[in-house]
Amino acid sequence: MADAFMAAGARVFICDVNAAALEATLASRPSLAGRVCDVSDEAQVAEFFVAGMAHLGGLDVLISNAGVAGPTANVEDISLAAWRQCMAVNLDSAFLCARLAAPVLRAQGSGSIINMSSTAGLFGFPRRAPYASAKWAIRGLTRTLAQELGPFGVRVNCICPGSVAGERIDRVIAAEALKTGRSEAEVYQEMVHAASLKTLIDPADIANLALFLTSSAGARISGQELAVDGHTETL
């Protein structure tokens, strides 16, 4: 996502809870800046926002892109702590960031917010109750913010990715295989065949949609939930 926006000429300020990962990312991209931040922590988000505003000199686009998979288990086997941790990272983070961005964008009369939902926010998702619940809630937050901020020229949309190729989906596949007693190859094939296009999603597909929505080409698009998922038929 950051690479795509920088390639389009944007100045970008990112965060990561993993200090080593952030350091490696910034070292390989001299024009990129960022700060270590746990986006479920109110104080850390406030510090991140202050640092980002100071570095960028303003704000045009906020992309709330942090997320964790949460537990893979039947609902009766999920602890309240695991539920809350999943909600904190996937939902609270978007709220905390939007709460800080809204006054800035409203005052300048322009800007765009992109929240990251999921196809899990469009379907029920067995054994993933916390994750699906958070992603459904992101849709509600998005529509509400679109109504609140629209009169001030601020657009708010959410993207609903399908199964995105990469290390994260590999961990999800492994967890599902372990829980259900199937092989990882079987779970992978099930994911691929859940979409009409019979393919996983490339991260660039999501970044390209975010670029479109935040550009002048998306100037009249707000309050929308756009799936980048190869047309998921079922989860």
Describe the function of each predicted region.
Residues M1-F13:
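Canonical Rossmann dinucleotide-binding motif of NAD(H)/NADP(H)-dependent dehydrogenases/reductases
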Residues A69-T72, F123, T199, A210-L211, ...:
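Short C-terminal tail/terminal secondary-structure segment
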Residues A98, A134, T142:
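Active-site helix of classical SDR
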Residues S118:
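Residue(s) in the substrate-gating loop at a strand-loop-helix junction
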Residues C158, G166, R182-A217, I221, ...:
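C-terminal helical subdomain
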